[in-house]
Structures are given as structure tokens and as C-alpha cells.
From Swiss-Prot:
Subunit structure: Homodimer. Part of the ribosomal stalk of the 50S ribosomal subunit. Forms a multimeric L10(L12)X complex, where L10 forms an elongated spine to which 2 to 4 L12 dimers bind in a sequential fashion. Binds GTP-bound translation factors.
GO MF term list: mRNA binding; structural constituent of ribosome
Name by which UniProt lists this protein: Large ribosomal subunit protein bL12
Protein origin, superkingdom: Bacteria
GO cellular component: cytosolic large ribosomal subunit
InterPro entries for this protein: Ribosomal_bL12, Ribosomal_bL12_C, Ribosomal_bL12_C/ClpS-like, Ribosomal_bL12_oligo, Ribosomal_bL12_oligo_N_sf
Record region (Disordered): 94-114
PANTHER family to which the protein is assigned, alphabetical: 39S RIBOSOMAL PROTEIN L12, LARGE RIBOSOMAL SUBUNIT PROTEIN BL12M
Similarity field: Belongs to the bacterial ribosomal protein bL12 family.
tRNA-binding found in the keyword field: no
Organism: Chlamydia caviae (strain ATCC VR-813 / DSM 19441 / 03DC25 / GPIC) (Chlamydophila caviae)
Gene Ontology BP terms: translation
Length: 130
């Protein structure tokens, strides 16, 4: 791309409304199969440079949906909708192209409960500290 076309792109993006930007974000996430989340590893790596300090236990956790057997998909879909509040279409998308993060920045007890619900529905799920 030329500098002029990049400037035109920046100008176009600058004129978008918040709703249009949210729609653009969703389209890019779907197209590239990524999520727009801030990288947490950089913060953790910077804290580890400090030296002898013992690593603190995480207070925030992410729940990861790893696998959904075909015969359990409907039950898992219901649980995903229940724990996330997503609409049917978004919940269905979340159960495809796994692994996917179902919940982020949640407490340990909430993460454990969510994983248990997903596993009871037949999914393979886990949680990890952020």
C-alpha cells in the first residue's frame, strides 16, 4: 500500500462511529479467527523480572472450551448461553473452531463452576490463571 492509501484508510477509520467500529472488530475477529484481547503475558513477564519474589496466585481466570463431541453439542450450547449470556448464533460460533475462551477475568470459584457445568454437559473444558 502507498502512503496515500494508508492515510485514506486511517481517515476512513477515524470517521467510523462506535457501533461501526464494534462491527468492524467482530468482522475481523471472524475473518482472522482471533479475539481482540489485551496480551496478558507481557505484564506477567515484566513482573517476573523482579527477582526472588514468589509468583502470586492468579485472582483472575479464563475458562477455555477445548472440545465438544458432536452428540453433546446442544447441551454444551445451552450451558455456553447460560454462562455467557450470548445469543444463540454467537454461542454456536463459540462452540466451533475450538479451543475458545468462554469467560475471561472471572474469579476462581466462578471459573471452577463454569468448567464443571461445561464438563457435565459433555464438553472438555479447563481454566487457567491470567
Amino acid at each position: 500500500m502507498t502512503t496515500q492509501s494508508l492515510e485514506t484508510l486511517v481517515e476512513t477509520l477515524s470517521n467510523l462511529t462506535v457501533l461501526e467500529l464494534a462491527a468492524l472488530k467482530k468482522l475481523l475477529e471472524d475473518k482472522w479467527d482471533v479475539t481482540a484481547a489485551a496480551p496478558m503475558m507481557a505484564v506477567a513477564a515484566g513482573a517476573a523480572v523482579g527477582g526472588d519474589a514468589a509468583p502470586a496466585e492468579s485472582t483472575e481466570f479464563a475458562v477455555i472450551l477445548e472440545d465438544v463431541p458432536a452428540d453433546k453439542k446442544i447441551g454444551v450450547l445451552k450451558v455456553v448461553r447460560e454462562v455467557t449470556g450470548l445469543a444463540l448464533k454467537e454461542a454456536k460460533e463459540m462452540t466451533e473452531g475450538l479451543p475458545k475462551t468462554v469467560k475471561e477475568k472471572t474469579s476462581k470459584s466462578d471459573a471452577e463452576d463454569t468448567v464443571k457445568k461445561l464438563q457435565d454437559a459433555g464438553a472438555k473444558a479447563s481454566f487457567k490463571g491470567l
